[in-house]
């Protein structure tokens, strides 16, 4: 099993790098604004029809465009979800959502969180799934990538005032990147048996004579962008554990690759655009080392399982509870780490059924800001925030003004960096405390003790960091949780994006200075180690007390009792 686990990790990383490197080169061309003659007429037609000017924007114009675009998306999706009962493509005649669930879902999908307090096959019409959720899967992913584009340009340009055009970036990312790759992935999924139809649900009689309903729907098209855009919201309640959504080991492997594909490619693109590939490689090394260690720990924890099973006559202690036998423990563990390292949140097993240690690693990966490859766009700009913090700390140690890629990092930059890094931990800890201190919050906890605390902590960690996965033992479809988690998702998304664009606006105006004797090299092993240490230190200082009350306490209860 040990050899199989390392072989799985190695094969995954090799295929990921082989696919993401050429995509990184293509993304670099988009960032630098190189024209693509084949689609220039399509672009020109879009600008004429929409009346949008494609002139470059400064930082605040870019931020305003992104914010207004997403607020409009929330309103439109909210209305669609509320009125779906009166709209077509609803063969099961499902009614509209309650207002608080519709608001939660709209905010969730627009912010790329895809937190789901409902089961899709019992709640949403095909129109809501296609025109609502799938569309926002594309647009929310494009938003994250566009913000990353703006920040990369800020490092690459100097003595400038503009970061690009938000509308141009959103259109090009959607047309040139997301749609073509999603189409290829969708065809692969269909070949593996993922559903893609508009038929009504099938009502069948099993061999045992039991009546059963089989849900149908346009699953493959939504599934493709669900993983490619690190969205994570499943067509069905069981998400990628459902055989109609993720039927084979191959489809499972493709899903994991798709989740990391664009985040990894953006690192390659970053190095190419700033003119030093070592910078992108350093980020990839830091991310990969943390990722591999996390996967190994989860695999070990799930294989070790529960020591109390053997005395009861079980053949193995290994923890198969909540997992699909077609994937097994190793592939399930890898998927869990991939989906929480990225801001995806898709699951092929029930994370609530993981061991205490196995569940703590996905929880911790979210809490450090999902900077280990991370979401599309958000993973890169999240890690670059830690890069700025790292060079600041290094500058303090040697008594020099911090700089990165020839740009001086001043007081304003560090204030915005601190704000962006601290906003999500603040939301997580305050939200968890509020839920535990109120009767409405405690009413949703179905498991007592340390695990119940972990479920609440996981919910707010997932929402604030725009992941969307859950410890499903928490009952969250209530006005209290729907509204509080919606606020956490919105602030967690734009409370980071706005400071990032403020940093970009500051950096793009600065002159690039040549490296001196005292300049910290940021492309070598020393800096990679410092960066990893900074990520671990911030995560440890922020969340160790909370983790000690939840998964750590639960782990000790199991093993010390044994």
From Swiss-Prot:
Entry keyword Transport: yes
Membrane topology: Multi-pass membrane protein
Main localisation: membrane
One Gene Ontology term of the molecular function aspect: potassium ion binding
Positions of transmembrane segments: 6-26, 62-82, 132-152, 175-195, 253-273, 283-303, 327-347, 356-376, 379-399, 416-436, 483-503, 526-546
Subcellular location per the Swiss-Prot or TrEMBL entry: Cell inner membrane
InterPro entries for the chain: KdpA
Keyword Transport part of the UniProt annotation: yes
Coiled-coil boundaries: none
One cellular component term from this protein's GO annotations in UniProt: plasma membrane
Keywords: Cell inner membrane, Cell membrane, Ion transport, Membrane, Potassium, Potassium transport, Transmembrane, Transmembrane helix, Transport
Quaternary structure note: The system is composed of three essential subunits: KdpA, KdpB and KdpC.
Protein family: Belongs to the KdpA family.
PANTHER family from the UniProt entry: POTASSIUM-TRANSPORTING ATPASE A CHAIN, POTASSIUM-TRANSPORTING ATPASE POTASSIUM-BINDING SUBUNIT
Function in brief: Part of the high-affinity ATP-driven potassium transport (or Kdp) system, which catalyzes the hydrolysis of ATP coupled with the electrogenic transport of potassium into the cytoplasm. This subunit binds the periplasmic potassium ions and delivers the ions to the membrane domain of KdpB through an intramembrane tunnel.
Protein name: Potassium-transporting ATPase potassium-binding subunit
Organism field: Yersinia pseudotuberculosis serotype IB (strain PB1/+)
Gene: kdpA
């Amino acid at each position: 099993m040990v050899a199989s686990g390392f072989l799985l990790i190695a094969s995954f990383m090799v295929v990921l790098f082989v696919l993401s490197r050429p995509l990184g080169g293509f993304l670099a061309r988009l960032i630098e604004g190189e024209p693509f003659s084949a689609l220039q007429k399509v672009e020109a037609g879009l600008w004429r029809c929409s009346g949008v000017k494609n002139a470059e924007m400064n930082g605040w114009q870019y931020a305003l465009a992104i914010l207004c675009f997403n607020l409009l998306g929330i309103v439109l999706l909210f209305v669609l979800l509320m009125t779906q009962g009166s709209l077509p493509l609803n063969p099961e005649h499902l009614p509209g959502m309650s207002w608080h669930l519709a608001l939660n879902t709209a905010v969730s999908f627009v912010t790329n969180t895809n937190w789901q307090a409902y089961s899709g096959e019992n709640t949403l019409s095909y129109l809501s799934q296609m025109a609502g959720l799938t569309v926002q899967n594309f647009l929310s992913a494009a938003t994250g990538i566009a913000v990353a584009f703006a920040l990369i340009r800020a490092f690459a340009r100097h003595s400038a005032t503009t970061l690009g055009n938000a509308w141009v970036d959103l259109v090009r990312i959607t047309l040139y990147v997301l749609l073509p790759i999603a189409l290829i992935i969708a065809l692969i999924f269909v070949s593996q048996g993922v559903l893609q139809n508009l038929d009504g649900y099938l009502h069948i009689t099993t061999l045992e004579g039991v009546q059963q309903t089989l849900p149908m729907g346009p699953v493959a098209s939504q599934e493709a962008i669900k993983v490619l855009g690190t969205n994570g919201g499943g067509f069905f309640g069981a998400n990628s554990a459902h055989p109609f959504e993720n039927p084979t080991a191959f489809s499972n492997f493709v899903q994991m690759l798709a989740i990391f594909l664009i985040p990894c490619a953006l690192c390659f693109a970053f190095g190419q655009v700033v003119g030093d590939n070592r910078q992108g490689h350093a980020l990839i090394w830091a991310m990969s080392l943390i990722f591999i260690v996390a996967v190994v720990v989860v695999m070990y924890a799930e294989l070790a399982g529960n020591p109390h099973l053997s005395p009861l006559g079980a053949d193995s202690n290994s923890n198969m509870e909540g997992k699909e036998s077609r994937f097994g423990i190793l592939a399930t563990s890898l998927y869990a780490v991939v989906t929480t390292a990225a801001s995806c949140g898709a699951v092929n097993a029930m994370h609530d059924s993981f061991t205490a240690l196995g569940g703590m690693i996905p929880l911790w990966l979210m809490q450090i800001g999902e900077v280990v490859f991370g979401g599309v766009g958000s993973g890169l700009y999240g890690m670059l925030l830690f890069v700025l913090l790292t060079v600041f700390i290094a500058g303090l140690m040697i008594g020099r003004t911090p700089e990165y890629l020839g740009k001086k990092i001043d007081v304003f930059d560090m204030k915005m960096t601190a704000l962006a890094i601290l906003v999500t931990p603040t939301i997580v800890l305050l939200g968890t405390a509020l839920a535990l201190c109120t009767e409405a919050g405690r009413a949703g906890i179905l498991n007592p003790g340390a695990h119940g605390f972990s479920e609440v902590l996981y919910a707010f960690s997932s929402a604030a960091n725009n992941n969307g996965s859950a410890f499903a033992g928490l009952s969250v479809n209530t006005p209290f949780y729907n509204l509080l988690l919606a606020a956490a998702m919105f602030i967690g998304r734009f409370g980071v994006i706005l400071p990032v664009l403020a940093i970009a606006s500051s950096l793009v105006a600065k002159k690039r200075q040549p490296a001196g004797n005292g300049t910290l090299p940021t492309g070598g092993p020393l800096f990679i180690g410092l960066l990893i240490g900074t990520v671990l230190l911030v995560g440890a200082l922020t969340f160790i007390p909370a983790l000690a009350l939840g998964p750590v306490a639960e782990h000790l209860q199991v093993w010390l009792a044994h």
